[in-house]
A protein has these predicted regions:
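A cytosolic-side transmembrane-helix exit/cap motif
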Residues: 463-473
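Charged, low-complexity intrinsically disordered terminal segments
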Residues: 1-442, 447-450, 454-460, 471
Length: 473
């Protein structure tokens, strides 16, 4: 827990204003009376899902970005098949792009044969060249309307790591929720299902009775709604003492980065924990390219030392926490279907703070070149021009070696030219395209012609649809 003195309790009026602002920003009401359990890493999630599905009596709803044809995915499918065979209504939504290369359509034949239903979100369509950008990135399991789990965990074996090769499990976070908030979770699922075909013909589950003392918001975002983005911005503005963020694919846009920078300059302890090694290398390069303005504002940045950090969490002032599927980037904020819970409870926020501190024990802190403290704005002296030579190169090599040894001993790494990787990749790509355009223009002409033709045909098709819908004059 944070050792600083506790913040003074806000007045009732101030608290009501804050709750109103958060509800309006997120587009989600605060629902009291819930019990919440914190799940850490894939194994805990898979065991909880399995036990809940085995206990199902009326219905099981599953929505996940990836359900892979591997031991974890097959075990989940077996539990769903068994539930369907004993008369439970089983409905599954998975993302087309997420499952591409992870499971074929035939993977679901046993469940369909048992009476289960499977729908796929946003297949690639000829009439929508850019429609594939929107993905169903949610991770949700609902059982009988009385048990629910949301998280960042997909149903795939890579979350368990590979003990035979010494690969540790992926680090991820999720929740089990019981209580009235399950009504909002089920409605979010029903909305997703109805967006892919006929609505569920199953009667809505009555709102569960209170199961605990935790108040939370279920934030079910859709493309272009930006509810979670507004909430994240508001939390950055409202934090008074701490704002500790964990994110798998952080690509901060200027407005959000400015919110974090303003909080840090106002004395808030802002921290960002991101992967040290990522399964999406391009995103990791973009993330590192944005470290410098954060560090210069006094924000502390940590990189995870394990195989992959996939959690998406926030905890502020030991009072407020968020857990779910949303990353701090434009894809999650504006393009995807995402699902998060924002929890207003000191005890739960305390658990999240303790977990964050445990996670920091397995990280390397990124620091500016002048050491522990950020360099004040305007304090960087101009670099003198020096003649090159073997001695300067040897000194630079010795400095890099010292930085490496120091990082290993202190769990700190000096921020190098982090923007260089992204700039190098972008520059080489553009130069290569320019060379191709000069030497082999037909190699670029054909893809460009196909893309223009695809977009043009899509626009003409939409125009015909509008014409057919026009009422006769």
């Amino acid at each position: 827990m944070n050792a600083a003195a506790p913040l003074p309790r806000p007045t009732l009026h101030a608290r009501l204003l804050a709750e109103q602002a958060l509800s309006r920003a997120a587009g989600a009401p605060l629902v009291a009376g819930n019990a919440v359990e914190l799940l850490i890493d894939g194994a805990a999630h898979f065991a909880a899902w399995q036990a809940a599905i085995e206990s199902a009596r009326t219905h099981v709803f599953v929505e996940n970005y990836i359900i892979a044809d591997d031991p974890v995915g097959r075990e989940l499918r077996a539990a769903l098949v068994a539930a369907a065979q004993r008369g439970v209504r089983v409905c599954v939504i998975h993302d087309w792009l997420g499952n591409l290369g992870n499971a074929r359509a035939a993977f679901w034949l046993p469940l369909r044969a048992a009476g289960g239903e499977v729908r796929v979100y946003n297949r690639l369509r000829a009439d929508s060249p850019f429609g594939w950008i929107s993905r169903d990135h949610r991770k949700l399991v609902l059982v009988d309307g009385v048990w629910g789990s949301l998280s960042g965990v997909c149903a795939a074996a890579k979350w368990l790591g590979d003990p035979t090769r010494g690969v540790p499990p992926w680090r991820d976070t999720g929740l089990v929720i019981r209580g009235p908030a399950l009504g909002d979770l089920e409605q979010a699922y029903r909305d997703s299902w109805a967006g892919l075909g006929a609505p569920l013909d199953l009667a809505a589950t009555p709102v569960p009775a209170p199961a605990g003392a935790i108040a939370l918001r279920v934030i079910a975002t859709h493309p272009q709604t930006a509810g979670l983005y507004r909430l994240d911005q508001l939390v950055a503005a409202m934090a008074q003492r701490t704002l500790w963020l964990t994110d798998a694919y952080f690509v901060g846009i200027p407005t959000y980065v400015q919110g974090l920078v303003s909080a840090a300059r106002d004395g808030v302890d802002v921290r960002l924990l991101v992967p040290g090694s990522s399964n999406l290398h391009a995103v990791a390069a973009l993330s590192r390219a944005g470290y410098r303005p954060l560090l210069e504002a006094g924000i502390r940045v940590f990189e995870w030392n394990g195989s992959m950090l996939h959690a998406k969490t926030a905890v502020a002032d030991d009072r407020w926490a968020r857990v779910g599927s949303s990353n701090l980037n434009l894809s999650s904020w504006l393009a995807n279907l995402e699902l998060d819970a924002a929890i207003d409870n000191e005890d739960f926020a305390g658990l999240m703070t303790e977990q964050y501190e445990r996670d920091l024990a397995n990280t390397t802190e990124i620091v500016l070149a002048d050491g522990r403290r950020p360099r004040p704005s305007g304090a960087v002296p101009p670099r003198p021009r020096r003649a090159g030579g073997s001695s300067s190169r040897a000194a630079a090599g010795a400095l890099r070696l010292a930085n490496t040894v120091g990082a290993a001993l202190s769990n700190r790494r000096v921020l190098g030219p982090s923007e260089g990787g992204a700039l190098l990749a972008g520059g080489l790509l553009l130069v290569a395209l320019a060379v191709l355009a000069v030497l082999l223009p037909q190699l670029l002409a054909w893809p460009l012609a196909l893309l223009c033709g695809w977009i043009g045909a899509s626009l003409l098709r939409k125009r015909l649809r509008l014409r057919r819908r026009r009422p006769p004059s």
